[in-house]
């Protein structure tokens, strides 16, 4: 009996399920789906693995580069498809692989000192809760370099003011992470938590209704906050780059320590 040759689009959902079983984050799963859809413009996902060739994969990469996306985006798309092909090889669907594509070296931006002065200025005492909360969030992002998904998932019980530490329950690696708080940040959180109140399992940075902030709500909150302070750039991830720059350049910090603080699995990720 002739063995069936599966179509790429048929196998992709199986790959995603296998990755979910391994415990990859929901954001990673979303990236798989988003990149797979985008790659569909450059590779016929209805073709079978028997029809897929080295030349077809090379044509996909050429088409990607000609589409006008950045070199790093090409690398990101290729990285996802390479992971997919690696799983397919292990499952016996194909013998093909995709070569590793190096990102082009780029200088990561960060908030300027002038922008930081504007962003870190404490709001007036009669400001509303949202503005005050956003000021605390900005302070936390600059002092910790944590990801947006991480800060949204911090609960009141995760903050130990006595030990000056905070636990990250939601990380890209899926592992709990305990990071230190500087004295100034601990003081800011102490005041904020006294005003915020709530149960231990409540989210630290909540909406006015005490609920967890969505990804979009956090992004919009920071955008509104930054614009009100006269700062046009509103990227949350830019705070992460700013923290890294401050730690390494301004404070002469150790790259290996920075790797742990940022939750990177390799030092190469920290360098980028």
Predicted regions and their residues:
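Conserved catalytic core of the tyrosine transesterase superfamily
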Residues: 1-272
């Amino acid at each position: 009996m002739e063995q069936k040759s599966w179509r790429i689009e048929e196998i992709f959902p199986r790959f995603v399920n296998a990755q979910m079983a391994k415990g990859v984050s929901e954001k990673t799963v979303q990236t798989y789906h988003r990149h797979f859809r985008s790659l569909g413009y450059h590779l016929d996902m209805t073709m079978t693995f028997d029809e897929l060739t080295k030349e077809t994969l090379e044509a996909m990469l050429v088409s990607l580069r000609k589409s006008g996306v950045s070199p790093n985006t090409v690398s990101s798309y290729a990285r996802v498809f390479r992971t997919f092909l690696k799983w397919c090889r292990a499952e016996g669907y194909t013998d093909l692989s995709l070569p590793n594509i190096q990102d082009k070296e780029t200088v990561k931006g960060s908030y300027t000192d002038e922008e930081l002065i504007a962003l870190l200025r404490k709001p007036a005492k009669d400001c509303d809760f949202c503005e005050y909360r956003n000021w605390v969030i900005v302070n936390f992002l600059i002092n910790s370099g944590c990801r947006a998904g991480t800060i949204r998932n911090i609960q009141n019980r995760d903050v130990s003011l006595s030990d000056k530490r905070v636990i990250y329950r939601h990380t890209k690696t899926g592992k709990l992470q305990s990071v230190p708080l500087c004295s100034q940040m601990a003081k800011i959180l102490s005041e904020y938590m006294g005003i915020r109140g709530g149960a231990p399992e409540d989210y630290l940075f909540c909406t006015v209704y005490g609920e967890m902030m969505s990804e979009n709500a956090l992004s919009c909150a920071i955008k509104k906050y930054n614009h009100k302070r006269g700062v046009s750039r509103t990227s949350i991830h830019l705070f992460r780059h700013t923290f890294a720059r401050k730690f390494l350049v301004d404070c002469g910090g150790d790259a290996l320590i920075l790797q742990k603080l940022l939750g990177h699995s390799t030092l190469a990720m920290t360098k980028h």
